Amino acid sequence: ANRLFFIFWEACKADNRCYGICYLKNRRSGFSFMSSSETVNQATISSDARFGILSKTGADAKKMFTDKVVPISTHYPFFFKPIQDGMDRPKTELAYRVPASKLTRKSITSTTKSNTDALEGLDTTIDWKNTGDNSYDGEKLRLLVHDESGKWERPDNILNNWRVTKTTLRLGS
């Protein structure tokens, strides 16, 4: 069943008109883990992109991020893993970019070879947001995982959020 899911997912990614999949599933089918692995996979091969996670509550989105996305990234082999900024087990954002370095007068005026051979990062991030109608408003997302979106609690509404996130996905593609 997972093979068919990923074949269909590849077809969705190839179609520019497609925003994604509304995947209805049985309990304990592993969708959260499959979507987390696809998020990390896409993030490690994309440059200058943003990936997001929303769930039925902000606590569930954070749990998906810390318990699924971060361990998948942590267990990547060193030859697939891009340069990462921040902690090895982040709580809010997984950033594939070159860590910031302190600017000094010497480093600004220096024209040594080390400045010209600077590392290049992907400038890609994966993060999660609290559940809300305006989550990810005004941002550009390459991929958004709506986990358990049918279980949103009032007053938040998935339809109102979709009006916002549809535009962010269109801008980020």
Where are these regions (language model features)?
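Phosphate/NTP-binding elements of NTP-utilizing enzymes
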Residues: 1-173
